[in-house]
Amino acid sequence: MIRKIVLGLTVAAFACTGAALAQGIKRTPLQKIDFPAGYTTVTAIAEIPAGGSAGRHTHPGVETGYVIEGEGDLMIDGQPTKHLKPGDSWAIPAGAIHDAKVSGDKPLKIMAIYIVEKDKPLATPVP
């Protein structure tokens, strides 16, 4: 019984860590399915307010996306900064530390697809 409580609290702590990351980004899930085996695929709309950033973080799987509105800079550790505008897309390898910062005076709105290891938090903040 105690083990189940400790496990539950540990899972809740990881979930809260992901929520803390969300201070600069709002994710609205559109679909979440357990596919392929051992992974969860999440399709979401993500929005970052003007002047904001997502905060440095990682995902336990790949992220791909498409810019709907606004502009921003995508910084992936070890790669040149990529400026994104409506119609642009990107791919981020599993575990890569990255951040997105809005440029201009409009919010950045994207559609993102995450294929992450099942039962792991969608995002984990890093310093």
Question: In which residue ranges do the predicted regions lie?
Answer:
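Extracytoplasmic
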Residues: T41-T43, H59-V62, Q79, G95, ...
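Ligand-binding loop in jelly-roll beta-barrel domains
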Residues: G95-D119
